[in-house]
Regions:
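Aromatic-rich peripheral "rim/lid" segments of glycoside hydrolase catalytic domains that contact
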Residues: 260-287
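Active-site acidic/histidine proton-transfer and metal-coordination neighborhood
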Residues: 53, 82, 89, 97-185, ...
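Acidic-and-aromatic substrate-binding clefts and catalytic sites of carbohydrate-active enzymes
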Residues: 40-46, 65-75, 96-104, 126-135, ...
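Bacterial N-terminal signal peptides that target proteins for export
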Residues: 2-12
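Bacterial N-terminal signal peptides
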Residues: 10-20
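N-terminal pre-domain/capping segments
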Residues: 25-118, 275, 282-287
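Acidic/histidine-rich catalytic cores of soluble enzymes
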Residues: 150-234
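Hydrophobic faces of well-ordered beta-strands that scaffold small-molecule active sites
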Residues: 31-36, 63-65, 90-95, 120-122, ...
Length: 287
């Protein structure tokens, strides 16, 4: 067991009282596969419906929104009908705290509920760079979790590198995790976790049942070799997939692509990462 896992094992022990519930969550059905639409941000602006049709054609089960709704920005029911027609589900939505502030909460939640979206995730907040800021965010996430629960919705937080600065077990991410209830989703972006020099597998294991949605992204640390496509980089995708299946309670594995090597187009790069992910999912060692 490496140092990272040893240190995080101590964090996991602190959640022992939640073990039964986490185990039940971890025994959920096989994770569905979605794509974060930020991955195709240029193509979707040029042809919204056509890009979604191509995503469906690749075999994705869902899409995670990033505040881009094309011709449907005022018509969530129309967008829901379009998704249904193409057998796509809403895997979640990225947004900011201010969209859930008093005065905007009702309109925001009504839009996403009509869209069939139950998972709302804060995409980033500059306060995540510090322990103090993360503690404050934890309080806000806790309040939002309580307010969203009666609507059948959840709140989550998505990391960048800033949340993983510091000693293992004492990062801003750990502060957010410990300061929020089990119902709050820890949407680990494994690309940013590895970029920050931390082990994404250990963090799934440290907080059982909290990785209900996760971003599978290949992102190379500075000075490392490889290609930023799932299966062509250095990430141990087999171990990570096994962890989200066995421990994370993961409902959605969401591919996110932010780098497009060798002149590849955005959708073509997403397709390449999907191919790599399918190979990982089929590996018996990833069970």
């Amino acid at each position: 067991m490496n140092t990272t896992i040893k240190q995080l094992a101590q964090c996991a022990a602190m959640t022992a009282l939640l073990g039964a519930g986490a185990a039940a969550h971890a025994a959920a059905a096989e994770p569905r596969i979605g794509v974060q639409l930020w991955s195709v941000k240029d193509e979707i602006k040029q042809d919204y419906a056509g890009t979604l049709r191509k995503i469906a054609g690749l075999g994705f089960q869902g899409v995670e929104f990033a505040c881009e709704f094309g011709p449907y920005k005022d018509d969530p029911a129309g967008l829901k009908a379009f998704l249904d027609k193409h057998r796509l589900q809403c895997a979640g939505a990225h947004l900011h705290f201010d969209q859930l502030a008093p005065g905007r909460f009702e309109a925001t939640t009504a839009f996403y509920r009509t869209l069939g979206c139950t998972s709302l995730v804060i995409s980033m907040d500059k306060r995540g760079a510090s322990i103090e800021g993360s503690a404050q965010m934890g309080k806000e996430l806790t309040a939002l979790a309580a307010r969203l629960a009666p609507l059948g919705m959840t709140i989550g937080y998505h990391n960048h590198a800033q949340e993983f600065v510091g000693a293992v077990g004492s990062t801003p991410w750990d502060t957010i995790a410990r300061g929020t209830p089990q119902a709050a989703v820890l949407q680990q972006d494994v690309g940013w976790t590895t970029f920050a020099g931390k082990d994404p597998v250990a963090y799934v294991q440290a907080y059982p049942g909290r990785t209900r949605t996760t971003h599978f992204k290949a992102k190379l640390a500075e000075g490392s070799s490889g290609t930023p496509i799932i299966g062509r980089d250095k990430t141990d995708w087999v171990a990570l997939t096994r962890a989200v299946r066995q421990v994370g309670g993961t409902d959605w594995i969401i591919i996110e692509q932010e780098e497009y090597p060798d002149g590849m187009g955005q959708l073509d790069t997403v397709a390449a990462s999907l191919k790599g992910l399918r190979a990982v999912l089929a590996n018996p060692a990833a069970r």
